[in-house]
Curated annotation (Swiss-Prot):
Residues 1-27 form the signal peptide. Its main location: periplasm. Predicted to be exported by the Tat system. The position of the signal peptide cleavage has not been experimentally proven. It is found in: Periplasm. The keyword Cell division applies. Belongs to the FtsP family. NCBIfam families: PRK10883.1, TAT_signal_seq. The keyword Cell division applies. It comes from Proteus mirabilis (strain HI4320). This is Cell division protein FtsP.
Length: 473
């Protein structure tokens, strides 16, 4: 039996691919990269916080550095921590070669300070908002929200965590030592080429972009070493479109303590926790027994799917390990029990308010038969007012509202699952969800709030609207 030159080259190429595939399987099976912890940037004594948007060199695989976008020299950007009651001055600087706008999702500030189209920064430009922090403790995230380019700008790396702290949260017996027992976890999926460079194809992302590599703080399959006891994970899903279902590989419980807009009234014990794009969660994990555990995000691609992924783009994740946690040493001095009461919330859920209908449409893209238009206000509300929104979708997708917070009344007529308890600003909608919305901050015709599909490609296509919230007297 003889081989032609073409057959020989094909066989040789396949052998190389299979070798690479088996290497990636081996590399992905054991976590050997320590979790990168973004630097902490805190507001102190009224000093401004500098946020520089720039190109950085980053090694997603730990070896080959590639040029991406980042903030203050890192990807993701530093974790910004502020205190409720402070007025925080930011100084954004755009050192990239195209216009960008930024926002902080979850931060309840007036429309003049939130960012967006009216605060677009040209290359070389600055923007210096002063943010009045007047809300309860919460895990938020700051990111690009450049109109019609939100998806590529977030994918390129313009993301970071934003923590609001208040006296009530500081007094609770919860892990709060940043990078020691309180960890920022930013999830993104990307598609990396052979040189470790992220690839993005907007035209192929007809239903949102899905990568094949799960990254946590810009790293694939990382680990952390911690003291025995309880740890806290602050989770942000910064992916363009992918929804995750997080669980422990050994079946242990995860204790949900906070949602998008802050702490729940009491912890919720769960075996798995869904996370839609844009959602934030805070969870506690008990490591007092000293047993290693891996947090996973579902099933990874099988061998044949991996093989196909060598020759054509795949939407399946090669590895779904989020984080391996390795407890060491003696018990932590932090409380050995989950507090039964976190915060008090006496909000009365009511359905007596006249509903407002919000319909997200895919074809043609828009909300209530209108494509996102920067010069148009789509709805008007009143600051501190309460509204009932009936949000419907043609295909399942997450939905986000700026400048407001809400509670989920029901999903498709059914009570929300425990994972959707508490105050939120982002929610996954299968068909129809009913929301009790509190309009916390004012916005204006030239500085409106935006509500949109949190599948970022959908928002860029025009599934978004703008609202003006008239100031209270």
């Amino acid at each position: 039996m003889s081989f032609s030159r073409r057959q020989f080259l094909q066989a040789s190429g396949l052998a190389v691919c299979l070798g690479s595939l088996s290497s990636s399987v081996r590399a992905g099976s054991v976590s050997d990269r320590k979790l990168p912890i973004p630097p902490l940037l805190e507001s102190r004594n009224g000093q401004p916080l500098f946020v520089t948007l720039q190109k950085v060199h980053w090694a997603f695989d730990g070896t080959q550095k590639t040029e991406v976008w980042g903030i203050n020299g890192s990807m993701p950007g530093p974790t910004i921590k502020v205190k409720s009651g402070d007025d925080v001055k930011l100084i954004y600087s755009n050192r990239l070669n195209e216009p960008v706008s930024m926002t902080v999702s979850g931060l309840l500030v007036p429309g003049t300070q939130i960012g967006g189209a009216a605060r677009m920064m040209s290359p070389g430009a600055y923007w210096s908002p002063v943010l009045p922090i007047r809300q309860k403790a919460a895990t938020c995230w700051y990111h690009a929200n450049t109109p019609f380019k939100m998806a590529p700008h977030v994918y390129n790396g313009l993301v970071g965590m934003w923590i609001v702290e208040d006296e009530e949260s500081k007094s609770l017996p919860l892990p709060k030592h940043y990078g020691v027992n309180d960890f920022p976890i930013i999830l993104q999926d990307k598609r990396l080429d052979n040189f470790g460079t992220p690839q993005y194809d907007k035209e192929a992302a007809t239903e949102g972009f899905y990568g094949d590599t799960l990254l946590v703080n810009g790293c694939e399959d990382p680990y952390i070493e911690v003291s025995r006891g309880w740890i806290r994970l602050r989770l942000v899903n910064a992916s363009n479109a992918r929804r995750y279902e997080l669980s422990a590989n050994d079946g242990r419980s995860l204790y949900l303590i906070a949602s998008d807009q802050g702490l729940l009234t009491s912890p919720v014990e769960l075996k798995s926790i869904p996370m839609a794009p844009g959602e934030r969660r805070e969870i506690l994990i008990d490591l007092s027994e000293g047993e290693e555990v891996t947090i996973t995000a579902g099933q990874s691609a099988g061998f044949m799917d991996r093989l196909r992924g060598i020759f054509e783009p795949s939407n399946l994740l090669r590895n779904t390990n989020v984080l391996t946690i390795k407890p060491t040493g003696l018990m932590s001095l932090v409380t050995d029990k989950v507090p039964q009461q976190l915060v008090v919330d006496d909000t009365q859920i009511t359905t007596s308010i006249q509903p407002r209908t919000i319909q997200l449409q895919n074809s043609p893209p828009g909300i209530n038969n209108a494509r996102w238009e920067l010069s148009r206000i789509d709805l008007v509300g009143k600051q501190n007012g309460w509204e009932r929104w009936l949000v419907t979708v043609e295909t399942p997708q997450p939905f986000h509202i700026e400048g407001a917070r809400f509670k989920v009344i029901n999903h498709d007529g059914q009570k929300p699952a425990p994972a959707d308890f508490g105050w939120k600003d982002t929610v996954w909608i299968e068909k129809q969800s009913e929301l009790l919305v509190e309009l916390k901050q004012p916005s204006y015709s030239h500085f409106p709030f935006v509500y949109y599909s949190q599948i970022l490609e959908n928002a860029d296509k025009g599934i978004a609207g703008q609202m003006e919230i008239t100031p209270s007297e």
